[in-house]
C-alpha cells in the first residue's frame, strides 16, 4: 500500500454502530474508511 492508502481506522459495516464509530473517529481527527457490503 502506498502512503495515500493508509488509514487510522477501518470500520466494517455501516449499521448504527459502524456509522457512529466512523463519525466519532473522524471527529477525533483519525483518517477513517467505512466499508459496507451493500451499494446505495
Curated annotation (Swiss-Prot):
It comes from the Eukaryota. It is an enzyme of class 1 (oxidoreductase). FAD binds at residues 36-40. It is found in: Mitochondrion matrix. Keywords: FAD, Flavoprotein, Mitochondrion, NAD, Oxidoreductase, Redox-active center. Its EC number is 1.8.1.4. InterPro entries: Class-I_Pyr_Nuc-Dis_Oxidored, FAD/NAD-bd_sf. This is Dihydrolipoyl dehydrogenase. It comes from Solanum tuberosum (Potato). The lineage of its organism: Eukaryota, Viridiplantae, Streptophyta, Embryophyta, Tracheophyta.
Amino acid at each position: 500500500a502506498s502512503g495515500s492508502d493508509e488509514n487510522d481506522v477501518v470500520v466494517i459495516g455501516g449499521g448504527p454502530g459502524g456509522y457512529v464509530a466512523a463519525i466519532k473517529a473522524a471527529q477525533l481527527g483519525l483518517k477513517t474508511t467505512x466499508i459496507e457490503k451493500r451499494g446505495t
